[in-house]
Amino acid sequence: LFSEDETPNWPPFHQFDQIIQTRACEGEAFYDGILSPNLTQDERNVVVQSYAGLLCSKQFYHYVVEDWLQGDPAIGKPPPERTQGRNKNWQHLYSRDIISMPDKWEYPWFAAWDLAFHMVPMAKVDPGFAKNQLSVFLREWYMHPNGQLPAYEFHLDDVNPPVHAWAARRVYEIEKESDKPDRNFLTSVFQKLLLNFTWWVNRKDDEGNNIFSGGFLGLDNISLFDRSSDVPMGGRLQQADGTAWMGFYCSNMMQMALELARDGDRHAIAYEDMASKFFEHFVQIVDAINTHGGTGLWDEIDGFYYDQVLLDHEVLPIKSRSLVGLLPLIAVTVIDEDQLDKLPGFRKRFEWFLKHRKDLARYIIHSRTGKKRWLISAVPFQRLQRILIRLLDP
């Protein structure tokens, strides 16, 4: 199709080879500025093809939940049970955006936690789009008023791992490496993530003891039963991965707050306070996963973290050695002397905590040599050694 005053040259495609060659040269020049010069040609080809797949997964996605529930008036009313079916609690969701799909051919629908992972490499080639994608799912036409993020169209209520903070932080850091830190982006997502974090704490920590459930949590075909549903034998599920993910969430929110507090403007003290809050919450989660009820979710005999079912005041570990029990390894962060030097309010609270909460400070390891650093990990050193035996056992 073309306008009558823009009749194409004839014969068609006579410049095809030249145009393709020009675009190929432009692509090579673009990746020269992104990729390491130390890559072999084969390695470079793999990376470029991977980025091509990532970039080609953008798709226009239009899904208005309220319209779907009410049906198309030109066709007729849908069955009344639809209004009480899936996604009925998401009538605010109005998706009309270009979104990065898991795969727009095989999986042509958004998956919020897949998208978060994908935006980290995307930040290398299109940081603006990466920031847009992470921001849009925190906007009021996606995020639920209670703070939950939508999962995917066939079950928006599903609960996936809270990786949005990590992805936003990494995208910010990648841009910062190019001397283009977007603090407005970091500030905006931090504020919205406070709502999501609160939703997790209020909805997935049933007893307020820093041991979390969560349900499915993205690990396909890894559980002995569908963790999105009730426990088959009754009782309540306590999840090693859910608790680890929340420790991971805390650590990233703490680091984001520390970064925002470094500005030294009139809002800095508020971010120092938030950093202290997430630091202490992180340590409390670390303590819970290791000591709640005795040894937390740790099995001393097997040397592994397990999900547990609480049934009639009895704790029943689900002894399946899977990634569920390895995920506590990701709940780790480092605080260094430079951060403390620039943030006197955070330093004061940090030092108070080390002095007066020795029961929890035992999870904080101070470097013995060189630059002063403090390591906080959900997995104490002795337990790490035992987990690695399971992980690396041939």
Segments (PLM) and residue ranges:
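Acidic, mature catalytic/reactive cores of soluble proteins
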Residues: L1-P394
